[in-house]
Amino acid sequence: MTQGYDTFLAATANDRRDAFVAAGRRLGAAEQNIEKDFWVCWTLDALFNGLPAGGPRLLFKGGTSLSKAFGLISRFSEDIDITVFRDDLGQGAHAADLEALSGKKRRARLDAIRAACQAYIAGTLTGQLIEI
């Protein structure tokens, strides 16, 4: 993970608040938005730089990715959109293969993919993030 986050988080609560207030004044934004943006960035750093190598790949997508990763838009984000590669969860399936299935079989296959993803997020990923 990026060392700057640890340094900032080691500061006192008052010093962190003062930093959010100062940044908010400089950027013309509410301090709450600055703090929320800090935690969005910390979470992205944790997900993409803090997890052990070899785990399921994650994909950062959506409007926040356009803002944070590519600088294409300027906004404060409410959430981040992350996808877990289903192949890495042992649930590989191409869209065409899923579409070829009957409705009942497709639902069952999608339910299995969803369950594998939920199990990874609630189990392994949550444990790794707690360790950070």
Regions found by a protein language model. Give the residues of each.
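Compositionally biased terminal segments of proteins
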Residues: 1-132
